[in-house]
Curated annotation (Swiss-Prot):
Cofactor field: Mg(2+); thiamine diphosphate
Origin organism lineage: Bacteria, Pseudomonadati, Pseudomonadota, Gammaproteobacteria, Lysobacterales
Keywords assigned by UniProt, alphabetized: Isoprene biosynthesis, Magnesium, Metal-binding, Thiamine biosynthesis, Thiamine pyrophosphate, Transferase
UniProt superkingdom: Bacteria
EC numbers, comma separated: 2.2.1.7
GO cellular component: cytosol
SMART domains, A to Z: Transket_pyr (SM00861)
Entry's cofactor comment: Binds 1 Mg(2+) ion per subunit. Binds 1 thiamine pyrophosphate per subunit.
Name of the encoding gene: dxs
Name used for this protein in its record: 1-deoxy-D-xylulose-5-phosphate synthase
This protein's pathway: Metabolic intermediate biosynthesis; 1-deoxy-D-xylulose 5-phosphate biosynthesis; 1-deoxy-D-xylulose 5-phosphate from D-glyceraldehyde 3-phosphate and pyruvate: step 1/1
Role description: Catalyzes the acyloin condensation reaction between C atoms 2 and 3 of pyruvate and glyceraldehyde 3-phosphate to yield 1-deoxy-D-xylulose-5-phosphate (DXP).
Keyword Methyltransferase: no
């Protein structure tokens, strides 16, 4: 429970209605309490940190002035919504964020009426908010709709599709877009738009006028002259800053204003509430505001494990087991030294995809295209037409956003593009919007694609080299976190395409493991005396090995950390069916549902694709396999 002594006002806020009972003069103190509570809570639980600290004042102002949940707030991405959750009935549960059955890390409609739209991916807020505004207009509702979007998210194309639509509508929608400009996405924001927005807050002429006004007016911030000057300043900015872009698209532009100046923020929002038609308010904020260490390291404090706020993040001592991301990071630098045609593209995920070292060692061969997955894939296709060997480093969940380009621009033309797909399969605490549980299904159906899934770290390196050597589109899909700990070297050895690896020769049943499931499958197979195969390739499958095993085994079990529907197991069934082979099959994988937020271990166990789950499923289907087993093994099966 919240400490009422430390948080005398926040402890009285259970819903925004409670917030609106306070005097406006108390909002600054409430914001201070909210910021302190967020630091304390996330310090204990871990989670997204710096983004929420940057919107404390904005969150308080919005819930104070707008009649939520009747008026609707749509948050882009959702990294910044912990303060929103605290003010909307989840204050005492916020310490459970990202945990199984705890508070979701992103807005989730099933969780709260105040979470108006489920998010996790970037740049969707304006489209969703416009849809809500149109529906309200058609229903005769006078509700207001607000979209809050960061400058990093403004780099995605669908933002401008939505702005273009909203600005040209008749009748005009009752829509406010708030541009939360902190010069960041997860990594530093990049591109021409970011530079333009930077000029908005850094104009020398504008700053000189502002400072001169301060000297004349002194501390008299609320006298009529001061209020007139502030209004004049907001219009004057249009001569120096990006208002023209938004005005030309049909939006009335206000700003930029200090997003941490709560009285001024409240004043601007009050004015905007009286205006009709699409509005855009540009606020300047600092990611990590109020916690000095986060302000100084906005990337490092974007998302944190539990830590002591009085000390900050502390590096763990001892040798660190490399993650699959680390394996890719080392490989891409090694391959770049050997292959001068290699170029790397990432959509705003330099740190997450393991490209910090590469970006420093090969800056002229590194392309961060911002949050623009569609552009990233077609950019790679264009490079490939000119003989380059592009690598697209991308999370599985974000590749969904570039799927048309993968098919239309890369695969149809059989171009040499390698997709290094991180966070494949079960991802864990970030929930459904960040899961990689669909990729094997949507990749294996694409003609000309080679699709690989490594069982360990060494195999990941080999597959990346194989994909680089392959003449055509290839994908290496690897999981979040660490692998089993295979020995690594700096070689760039390749694998024969479409050839599986026999891990254990047994009898009766063959366990066919794909990717991260192979180790668990091997443990079960050795225990029960079954054949175990590391399939390696989802496409093409090792047809020769599968047909040979079908002659000598009574059944197949396929195991994958992907949805069963259309996945690797489906490919095995299709291959046998094409050869008119009838064989009992058991497909183990992820269910036909979206993953909730929980630990990776919990989710694998729930799906029955950890060691215990595989063993139980196999023995349930073929109970005769227990014949002759010891009681201890029988007990383990339960």
């Amino acid at each position: 429970m919240i400490d009422t002594t430390r948080y005398p006002r926040l402890s009285r806020i259970h819903t925004p209605d409670d917030l609106r009972r306070f005097d406006e003069a108390e909002l600054t103190v409430i914001a201070e309490e909210l910021r302190s509570y967020l630091i304390e809570s996330v310090g204990k639980s871990g989670g997204h940190f710096a983004a929420g600290l940057g919107v404390i004042e904005l969150t308080v102002a919005l819930h104070y002035l707008y009649q939520t949940p009747v008026d609707q707030l749509v948050w882009d991405v959702g990294h910044q919504t912990y303060p929103h959750k605290i003010l909307t009935g989840r204050r005492d549960q916020i310490h459970t964020v990202k945990q199984k059955d705890g508070v979701a890390p992103f807005p989730k409609r099933e969780e709260s009426v105040y979470d108006t739209f489920g998010v996790g991916h970037s740049s969707t807020s304006i489209s969703a908010a416009l849809g809500m505004a149109i529906a309200a207009q058609r229903n005769g509702d006078d509700r207001k709709v607000v979209a809050v979007i960061g400058d990093g998210a403004m780099t995605a194309g669908m933002v401008y599709e939505a702005l273009n639509h909203a600005g040209g509508m008749d009748p005009e929608p009752n829509l406010l877009v708030i541009l939360n400009d902190n010069r960041m996405s997860i990594s530093e924001a990049v591109g021409g738009l970011t530079k333009m927005l930077g000029r908005a807050s850094g104009s020398r002429t504008l700053n000189a006028i502002r400072e001169g006004g301060k000297k004349i007016l002194g501390d008299k911030k609320n006298n009529p002259t001061a209020r007139f000057v502030r209004r004049w300043e907001e219009h004057w900015k249009g001569m120096f800053v990006p208002s023209t872009l938004f005005e030309e698209m049909g939006f009335h532009y206000t700003g930029p204003i200090d997003g941490h100046d709560l009285p001024r923020l409240v004043g601007a929002l009050k004015t905007l509430q009286t205006l009709k038609g699409p509005q855009l308010l540009h606020v300047i904020t600092t990611k990590g505001k109020g916690y000095e260490l986060a302000e100084g390291d906005q990337i490092g404090y974007h998302a944190v494990s539990p830590f002591d706020p009085s000390k900050g993040l502390v590096a763990k001592g001892g040798a660190k087991k490399p993650t699959y991301t680390d394996v890719f990071s080392d490989w891409v630098c090694d391959m770049a030294a050997a292959e001068p045609k290699l170029l790397v593209i990432t959509p705003a995920m330099r740190e997450g995809s393991g490209l910090v070292r590469f970006s420093k060692e090969y800056p002229q061969r590194y392309f961060d295209v911002a949050i623009a997955e569609q552009h990233a894939v077609t950019l790679a296709a264009g490079m490939a037409t000119q003989g380059a060997k592009p690598v697209v480093a991308i999370y599985s969940t974000f590749l969904q956003r570039g799927y048309d380009q993968l098919v239309h621009d890369v695969a149809v033309q059989q171009l040499d593009v390698l997709f290094a797909i991180d966070r494949g399969g079960v991802v864990g605490p970030d929930g459904a919007t960040h899961a990689g549980n669909l990729d094997l299904s949507f990749l294996r159906c694409v003609p000309h694609m080679v699709v690989m899934a490594p069982a360990d770290e060494a195999e990941c390196r080999q597959m990346l080299s194989t994909g680089m050597q392959y003449q055509g589109p290839a994908a290496v899909r690897y999981p979040r976190g660490t692998g089993p700990g295979a020995a690594l070297d700096s070689s760039l050895a390749t694998l024969p395409i479409g050839k599986a690896q026999l891990r254990h020769s047994g009898t009766r049943i063959a366990l066919l493991g794909f990717g991260a499931t192979v180790d668990a499958a091997e443990a079960v197979g050795r225990d029960l005396g079954l054949t175990v195969v590391n399939m390696r390739f989802v496409k093409p499958l090792d047809k020769a090995m599968l047909l040979e095993l079908a002659k000598t085994h009574e059944g197949f079990v396929t195991i994958e950390d992907n949805v069963v529907a259309g996945g690797a197991g489906s490919g095995v069934s299709e291959l046998l069916n094409a050869e008119a082979i009838t064989l009992p099959m058991l497909h183990l994988g992820l269910p036909d549902s979206f993953q909730h937020h929980a630990s990776r271990e919990d989710l694998l166990a729930e799906a029955g694709i950890d060691q215990a789950g595989i063993r139980t499923a196999v023995l349930k289907r073929w109970p005769q396999l227990m014949t002759g087993k010891t009681p201890s093994l029988n007990a383990a099966a339960g």
